[in-house]
Curated annotation (Swiss-Prot):
Protein name as annotated: Glutamate 5-kinase
This protein's pathway: Amino-acid biosynthesis; L-proline biosynthesis; L-glutamate 5-semialdehyde from L-glutamate: step 1/2
Gene of this entry: proB
Annotated localization: Cytoplasm
Originating organism: Klebsiella pneumoniae (strain 342)
GO terms for MF: ATP binding; glutamate 5-kinase activity; RNA binding
GO (cellular component) term, any one: cytosol
Function field: Catalyzes the transfer of a phosphate group to glutamate to form L-glutamate 5-phosphate.
Similarity field: Belongs to the glutamate 5-kinase family.
Enzyme Commission number, as recorded: 2.7.2.11
Positions contributing to ATP binding: 10, 169-170, 211-217
InterPro entries cross-referenced by the UniProt entry: AceGlu_kinase-like_sf, Asp/Glu/Uridylate_kinase, G5K_ProB, Glu/AcGlu_kinase, Glu_5kinase, Glu_5kinase/COase_Synthase, Glutamate_5-kinase_CS, PUA
GO biological process, one term: L-proline biosynthetic process
Reaction equations catalysed: L-glutamate + ATP = L-glutamyl 5-phosphate + ADP
Length: 367
């Protein structure tokens, strides 16, 4: 492990709190020690931290608040500053500076903002500063949220050009069944490609404080691995888990990176949270999956959500299965007008056209 590597460490709420209602500072101190040790060896470390709402609730004395988005955002606004203060305080013991990055889905959906976020993150790393990343929960609405820090960590790994992504949780890894209810469940140590069978056995996190269960960790691993980034799911309370993961020692479930990773633009398409979705017919599904064809308006049955031209959208088949993500050539209003129509009719219907396809195959990733 002599060469410098970049590691993204995602710390879930259940890891930071130990399953309690407050931050477990002793455990966070130990996690920082492990990161600082790798930093001193010349490695580049990125932290994706949950816990802002838990920190806010603790700081305010566990107030009785209505179960509303505004209440969560209030707690996040208070807790975010407490959280970054804690990271800064602990890393400063080792003479390490931290830099905070708060992101929303909009930063990932827009290619220019995605590149700006990438440049900022890499500038921090180039100057030996540890980026501390969280979703901007104080302002993010359901429409602009990435949704969970597992998927955010996969996007951060792509932005950072990471070698490895470590998802620390309250479970030792991915099991063949739920270990809490099935004593015969076995730890899956290595995964080479994520399929529907693997997704089916992914259970939910035992913690009620976070938003990400094992299913979202599989989503994150899928995104990272297809971008050429090894991903490990491991228990946050395992001794020296961060250093051992960096060394390549078995610490949980290792999802091995795709041998031929996606090129940079397609990494963005694959990782960006979809702004909307299209449901397509059987003919379009077959053309996309079997021939790698572009999506024509003729094959579109339903347009869901509101999105602009140039945004990433999800493409589903008639059974609701996610078959592809791609960049839309038309906005949602235009697609509703031309859905089910032949491409030759686009100009007559809209009064303009951006070409005959709704999503070009060069701007599409098969899921």
């Amino acid at each position: 492990m002599s060469e410098s590597q970049t590691l993204v460490v995602k710390l879930g709420t259940s890891v930071l709190t130990g399953g309690s209602r407050r931050l477990n500072r002793a455990h966070i101190v130990e996690l920082v020690r492990q990161c600082a040790q790798l930093h001193a060896m010349g490695h580049r470390i990125v932290i994706v931290t949950s816990g802002a709402i838990a920190a806010g609730r603790e700081h305010l004395g566990y107030p009785e608040l209505p179960a509303t988005i505004a209440s969560k955002q209030l707690l996040a606004a208070v807790g975010q500053s407490r959280l970054i203060q804690l990271w800064e305080q602990l890393f400063s013991i080792y003479g390490i500076h931290v830099g905070q990055m708060l992101l929303t889905r909009a930063d990932m959906e827009d290619r220019e903002r995605f590149l700006n976020a990438r440049d900022t993150l890499r500038a921090l790393l180039d100057n030996s500063i540890v980026p501390v990343i969280n979703e901007n929960d104080a302002v993010a609405t359901a429409e602009i949220k990435v949704g969970d820090n597992d998927n955010l960590s996969a996007l951060a790994a792509i932005l950072a050009g990471a070698d490895k992504l470590l998802l620390l949780t309250d479970q030792p890894g991915l099991f063949t069944a739920d270990p809490r209810s099935n004593p015969q469940a076995e730890l899956i140590k290595d995964v080479y490609g994520i399929d529907d069978a693997l997704r089916a056995i992914a259970g939910d996190s035992v913690s009620g404080l976070g938003t990400g269960g094992m299913g979202t960790k599989l989503q994150a691993a899928d995104v990272a691995c297809r971008a050429g980034i090894d991903t490990i799911i491991a228990a946050g309370n395992r001794p020296d888990v961060i250093g051992h993961a960096m060394e390549g020692l078995p610490v949980g479930t290792c999802f091995h990176a795709q041998e031929s990773p996606l090129e940079n633009r397609k990494r963005w398409i694959f990782g960006a949270p979809p702004a909307g979705e299209l449901t397509v017919d059987a003919g379009a599904t077959q053309a996309i999956l079997e021939r790698g064809s572009s999506l024509l308006p003729k094959g579109i049955k339903i347009v869901s959500g509101n999105f602009s031209r140039g945004e990433v959208i999800r493409i589903r088949n008639s059974e609701g299965r996610d078959i592809a993500h791609g960049v839309s050539r038309y906005n949602s209003d235009a697609l509703r007008l031309i859905a089910g129509q032949h491409s030759q009719q686009i100009d007559a219907i809209l009064g303009y056209e951006y070409g005959p396809v709704a999503v070009h195959r060069d701007d599409m990733i098969i899921r």
